[in-house]
């Protein structure tokens, strides 16, 4: 085992046995990938890492359409795009997201660089935006700062349908204003994205998780309730009892959910300020005709939330609910990462999970790929140069055209043009070069005629406009 000539594939379990003494340096496989297939004794096929994906051209068009909707709606609400690094100091997420969160405890991709600094691939976007807000002194600009981002995140969790270890989120953050109007506007934007995509079966769920003052009171009564159920709780929830008992209410384990039925809710412990804030948020949502459901078990998985918390869930065929979007208020996070006391409110939306729902509901985004106006079919080197000149001039004018670069026969080029859905094929061969013309064929009607080479650009531009 260990010699490429003796095995067909290598799995992580086998890596510890490599290399063997009989291997030659050329045939020994020393690469930690999901599966490495050995071909003809020397060539190794390296596959993508488990939990990642290749977004191929056919699929990427749906991504572009989805991103276009998000850019448009966030712009209409007055948000500006921010782009932060994909890796940050580990301390940012430990302090910002919270030591007791699942993300920090078991899901982060953390490593040391050459300077022995602990770095982490970002598992979420809010902490990075708050760090950028502080570092770049955005608190000195007119408030609120309304920011949004679209980009990849990384978590080491079990991959499943619509869930990946590298995944993409749209996130919006409003920093600098503690006003229920902000909560209502952010929630309204999240709901409008779902409406713009025509997603069916969605439900907005809201809750108030209180502030540190009223959460201390709630913790006492909740802990007393949960201690009586301790032995029946899963191991993870037993650990949560000591660190953050509210997270027990968020457990997806069926037995834990059954045991926590009837647990004291945050509603019973809210201080007057938090209760007034939540009442005003609800009143504003009602004013805007945004339907919602109160969910007292909704606590979110991140430790930084205060007051308002919400999720948007979509009903699935099996009768379960899939949370596609979640967020809330985080009035202490900017201060946690070194800034001045600054209120904040935002949400994040999982793009892979949203695209899966769109696919499941057979919702198509946009009109798909727009084919080029024309294909240039050139036969021979001099014809290729002439065609390339025409191609370049048309592209500078914004006219979408394509050209064969494989040197294929005219028949093959016409077949490709027909497959690509172009309207015209411009044929230039040696005979056409001598006469100073090009043959233009209408691919749908089958008609063709001659156009002077010098007039080709102007003729096609008129057809495009």
Stretches with model-predicted labels:
Residues 9, 27, 33:
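Cationic, low-complexity basic patches in intrinsically disordered or flexible, solvent-exposed regions
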Residues 2-5, 41:
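Residue-identity detector for glycine
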Residues 5-8, 12:
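Positively charged N-terminal leader segments that act as targeting/secretion signals
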Residues 40-416, 420-465:
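TRNA-recognition modules of translation machinery and tRNA-sensing kinases, especially anticodon-binding
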Residues 3, 20-23, 28:
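Cysteine-centered motifs
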């Amino acid at each position: 085992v260990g010699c490429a000539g003796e095995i067909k594939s290598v799995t992580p379990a086998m890596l510890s046995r490599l290399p063997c003494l009989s291997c030659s340096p050329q045939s020994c496989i020393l690469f930690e990938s999901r599966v490495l297939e050995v071909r003809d004794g020397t060539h190794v096929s390296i596959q993508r890492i488990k939990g990642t994906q290749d977004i191929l051209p056919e699929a990427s068009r749906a991504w572009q359409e989805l991103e276009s909707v998000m850019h448009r709606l966030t712009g209409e609400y007055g948000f500006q795009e921010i782009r932060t690094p994909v890796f940050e100091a580990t301390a940012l997420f430990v302090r910002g997201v919270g030591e007791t969160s699942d993300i920090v405890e078991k899901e982060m991709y953390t490593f040391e660089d050459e300077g022995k600094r602990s770095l982490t691939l970002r598992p979420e976007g809010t902490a990075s935006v708050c760090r950028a807000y502080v570092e770049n002194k955005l608190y000195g600009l007119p408030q609120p700062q309304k920011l949004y981002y679209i980009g990849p995140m990384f978590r080491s969790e079990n991959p499943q349908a619509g869930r990946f270890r590298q995944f993409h989120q749209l996130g919006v953050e409003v920093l600098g204003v503690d006003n229920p109007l902000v909560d209502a506007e952010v929630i309204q934007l999240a709901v409008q994205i779902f409406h713009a995509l025509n997603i069916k079966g969605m439900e907005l769920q809201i809750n108030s998780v209180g502030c540190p003052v009223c959460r201390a009171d709630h913790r006492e009564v909740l802990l007393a309730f949960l201690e009586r159920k301790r032995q029946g709780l899963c191991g993870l929830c037993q650990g949560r009892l000591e660190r953050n008992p509210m997270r027990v209410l968020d457990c997806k384990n069926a037995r834990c959910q059954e045991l926590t039925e009837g647990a004291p809710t945050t509603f019973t412990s809210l201080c007057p300020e938090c209760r007034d804030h939540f009442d005003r948020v609800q009143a504003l949502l009602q004013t805007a005709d945004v339907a919602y459901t109160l969910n007292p078990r909704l606590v979110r998985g991140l430790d930084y939330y205060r007051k308002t918390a919400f999720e948007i869930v979509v009903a699935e065929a099996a009768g379960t609910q899939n949370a596609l979007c979640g967020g809330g208020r985080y009035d202490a996070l900017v201060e946690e990462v070194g800034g001045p006391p600054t209120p904040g409110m935002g949400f994040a939306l999982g793009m892979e999970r949203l695209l899966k729902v769109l696919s499941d509901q057979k919702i198509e985004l946009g009109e798909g790929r727009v084919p080029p106006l024309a294909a240039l079919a050139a036969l021979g080197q001099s014809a290729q140069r002439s065609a390339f000149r025409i191609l370049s001039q048309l592209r500078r004018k914004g006219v979408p055209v394509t050209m064969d670069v494989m040197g294929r026969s005219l028949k093959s080029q016409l077949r490709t043009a027909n497959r690509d859905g172009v309207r015209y094929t411009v044929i230039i061969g040696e005979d056409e070069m001598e006469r100073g013309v090009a043959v233009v064929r209408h691919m749908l009607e089958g008609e063709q005629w001659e156009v002077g080479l010098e007039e080709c650009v102007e003729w096609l531009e008129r057809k495009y406009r």
